[in-house]
């Protein structure tokens, strides 16, 4: 038994260190190839799907809804945005703080691909952790914190966090 993010789990699976690998995404082509090269046969068995939540500190009363373009302006690797006011006129002229799952996380892969157009495309100045509880504590303790992680972590901590409605183009 091992604990890691999805990417790390697949690395251990391909190395023969684990027999089962749960994941928050489908196995990637390079991971399929790694299994084939190692002589490992596998099956994908979807058991459940998780939601993804973008969250802010409970005291944040302005970032209640954001567009994909606004998220990209915050999270993309080439983003120069530093303050909430850089994201939307009328928001505070204070620096935001980004918290994100580690780069071995399937949640990280999904978010960066969906929001920023490429898996792994994320600015390096975020605070990264494979432990979502660390991200929860970071945002809960930082009035200008923002993070993304599995919906279950928001539900467990909604007394400390606010969830951001995402407008994908048709309204939140």
What are these regions (language model features)?
Residues 1-172:
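Exported/periplasmic ABC-transporter solute-binding proteins
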């Amino acid at each position: 038994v091992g604990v890691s993010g999805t990417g790390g789990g697949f690395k251990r699976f391909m190395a023969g260190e684990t027999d089962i690998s749960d994941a928050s995404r489908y196995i990637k082509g390079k991971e399929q190839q790694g299994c084939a090269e190692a002589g490992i046969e596998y099956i994908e068995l979807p058991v459940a799907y998780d939601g993804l939540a973008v969250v802010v500190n409970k005291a944040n009363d302005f970032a209640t809804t954001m567009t994909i373009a606004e998220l990209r302006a915050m999270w993309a690797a080439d983003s120069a945005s530093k303050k909430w006011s850089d994201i939307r006129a009328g928001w505070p002229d204070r620096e935001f703080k980004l918290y994100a799952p580690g780069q071995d996380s399937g949640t990280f892969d999904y978010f960066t691909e969906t929001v920023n157009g490429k898996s792994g495309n994320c600015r390096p100045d975020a605070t990264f952790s494979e432990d979502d509880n660390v991200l929860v504590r970071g945002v809960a303790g930082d009035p200008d914190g923002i993070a993304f992680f599995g919906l279950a972590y928001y539900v467990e901590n909604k007394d400390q966090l606010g969830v951001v409605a995402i407008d994908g183009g048709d309204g939140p």
